[in-house]
């Protein structure tokens, strides 16, 4: 097959004062040119966007509170009818991640966020042969999160700890689809429901984009300014010990700048792919870290349960891992 020609595109990143070169297929060049310009225009977080996102998070908290009542399904997999539920449990125990896109509504209506996009995803993984205490201790080992979650977390530090509440610092870093880094602070609260169930809620208190993402000590851009790739983030963990291990579920709710409607048809699938990859990496890194803590053997990045979106390695027999489609069904 003949390779398609590419254009070298040079455009200015106004948030960093740099000129950037990239290559894209000729067929998409003229379609993407306006979007490339928009992506490099600085975005500023507005109060109306913050208020709408806070409203979405409040509604999500209320929904999750109802889901955690005694007798309610603890994991989203438990809400599925049989035999689909048992099939997914079997796949989880074989090493598969189950990931789906979520959406909190009010009175069957979407919660609109002006000038912003909400990225809400839920994922579940199973870690065999470990206890709930071990899984929770890994999540609370914040000084070593840079080891557990590298390269996505470049720096980490526990700032304060009182009872079941932690204040932490994390420096996020990604080099794809474009290089970006953030200094962030979170407040995390843990609740032990009973001997086999625990939950946590992490809410961002501060997110600032770095002016030069390749430099860990780079000056920050003012909070709420920059490219607008990440303005707010909340993560909710649920841990359940059963079936000889621990099921881990994480809900991630993030806020970013919006995408102009004219480009949504092209950009939204890319956003979904990146969001799904990010959550898959979070779950897989957590599982790998818990397994390493439980066995005393450091699991490498060649661990056989790698999500296919994160590696080109051929899956190991009987440990083929897939990511669930948005409707909860495994991808074909």
Describe each PLM feature range.
Residues 12, 25, 42-43:
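General secretory precursor processing signal
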Residues 23-39:
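Bacterial N-terminal signal peptides
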Residues 43-332:
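Eukaryotic helix-grip
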Residues 1-22:
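N-terminal secretory signal peptides that target proteins for export/translocation
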Residues 18, 31-36, 310, 318-319:
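Leucine-biased recognition of intrinsically disordered, low-complexity hydrophobic segments
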């Amino acid at each position: 097959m003949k390779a398609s020609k590419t254009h070298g595109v040079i455009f200015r990143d106004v948030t960093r004062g740099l000129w950037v070169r990239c290559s894209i297929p000729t067929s998409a060049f003229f379609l993407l040119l306006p979007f490339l310009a928009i992506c490099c225009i600085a975005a500023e977080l507005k109060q109306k966007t913050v208020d709408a996102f806070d409203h979405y998070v409040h509604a999500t908290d209320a929904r999750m509170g109802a889901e955690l009542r005694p007798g309610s399904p603890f994991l989203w997999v438990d809400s599925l009818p049989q035999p689909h539920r048992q099939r997914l449990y079997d796949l989880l125990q074989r090493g598969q991640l189950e990931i789906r896109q979520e959406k909190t509504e009010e009175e069957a209506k979407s919660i609109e966020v002006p000038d912003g996009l909400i990225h809400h995803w839920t994922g579940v993984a199973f870690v065999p042969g470990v206890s709930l205490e071990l899984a929770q201790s890994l999540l609370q080992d914040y000084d070593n999160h840079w080891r557990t979650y590298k390269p996505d977390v470049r720096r980490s530090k526990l700032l304060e700890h009182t009872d079941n509440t932690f204040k932490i610092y994390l420096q996020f870093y990604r080099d794809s689809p474009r290089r970006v880094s953030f200094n962030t602070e979170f407040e995390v609260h843990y609740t032990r429901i009973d001997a086999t169930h625990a939950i946590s809620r992490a809410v961002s208190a501060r997110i600032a984009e770095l002016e030069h993402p390749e430099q860990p000590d780079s000056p920050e851009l003012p909070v709420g300014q920059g490219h607008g790739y990440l303005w707010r983030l909340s993560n909710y963990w649920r841990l359940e010990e059963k079936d000889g291990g621990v099921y881990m579920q994480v809900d991630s709710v993030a806020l970013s700048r919006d995408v102009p409607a004219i480009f949504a048809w092209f950009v939204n699938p890319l956003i979904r792919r990146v969001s799904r990859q990010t959550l898959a990496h979070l779950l897989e890194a957590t599982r790998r870290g818990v397994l390493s803590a439980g066995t005393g053997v450091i699991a490498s990045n060649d661990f056989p349960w790698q999500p296919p979106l994160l590696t080109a390695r051929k899956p190991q027999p009987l440990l083929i891992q897939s990511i669930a489609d948005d409707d909860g069904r495994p991808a074909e």
